[in-house]
A protein has these predicted regions:
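Flexible loop/hinge segments at secondary-structure junctions
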Residues: 1-149
Length: 149
């Protein structure tokens, strides 16, 4: 942290502890592509966690740590990074709003797929997800609302 001019309270040796997801995670793959680029590589020595909640928990407990996770896993006990846009514009803080309007540069959509046109119980479930009740639950869990693409 000291090399980039940042003082982190409680971080005694100023060494950045990088917390990541395991390489079989879609979150890992998306972050790698969106942030590190097609040929980018994670550095050696990352602490690879099983799930997003595990990443957030470790970052919260480790003063020198930095990590990435889905917005729905954010807590009041960690600081979320404001990310610069590729065009050099002002940085954008992560929120449901900036994920929904796609202004947060590393927000990603989540998709649900069906084998053919949904029918029966699957159609009922998808209709419920798009309903006001379903959308309230999605927003309450920290995810952006569902949009038809």
């Amino acid at each position: 942290w000291g090399d980039i001019g940042v003082e982190v309270p409680g971080c005694k040796n100023n060494e950045i502890v990088v917390v990541s997801r395991q390489n079989n995670s879609d979150t890992y793959a998306y972050f790698k592509k969106a942030v590190l680029g097609a040929k980018g590589k994670y550095r050696q020595g990352t602490l690879d966690m099983h799930g997003s909640k595990d990443v957030v928990d470790l970052v919260e407990k480790t003063p020198c740590a930095i990590g990435y996770s889905g917005l729905a896993y954010a807590t009041d006990h960690i600081k979320m990074a404001c990310i610069d846009k590729a065009d050099g514009g002002d940085c954008v803080s992560p929120s449901v709003g900036t994920a929904s309007d796609r202004s947060y540069p590393i927000a990603r959509p989540l998709f649900m797929y069906t084998n053919g046109e949904p029918k029966g119980e699957i159609k009922k479930y998808l209709d419920w997800i798009h309903s006001e009740e379903g959308q309230c639950i999605i927003l309450g869990k920290g995810y952006a609302s569902v949009r038809d693409l």
